[in-house]
């Protein structure tokens, strides 16, 4: 039995752990595990994270998602996120951000590739930064994203309003900063895209 499972059984009263065992076993993994279980989901634990099966999903097959717990004050580290995305498995990669009240907010993260587009007649980019050179070369219109609290807003040929907001990830940013960005993006119906070491990640709020 995994520590997370033992703590959850203790919480439900199935058996009792000692105070020392509780202190030893408590972790961010447990906080997210307990939250998912309380939502009625089937959760399995492995060394990568928490494998979650959507309701009515057969548990003998592929998990619906892998959930990676993150503390809201942690500085951002994408190592295990990229590791999961690069596996190419047919499951969502999610993070569960834990706040100071031990509540959890969930986000789905996807690797993103930009397809070719073109500028609308009479439109132009006002940004020429190296961070978005790829997008400019592919025909996207790039303008400042300051009014949305991000670095850039991005238009393709089909859009009258910017579908994407790009934020460049630099040292010192934590997961609370990301949660703020996604909240703003959700409120104005835009997808937040994180630019990190010449890679692109879209991030959206999700209800488990």
Where are these regions (language model features)?
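Conserved phosphate-interacting/catalytic interface
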Residues: 1-143, 158-208
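Phosphate-end processing signature that detects enzymes handling 5′-triphosphorylated RNA
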Residues: 146
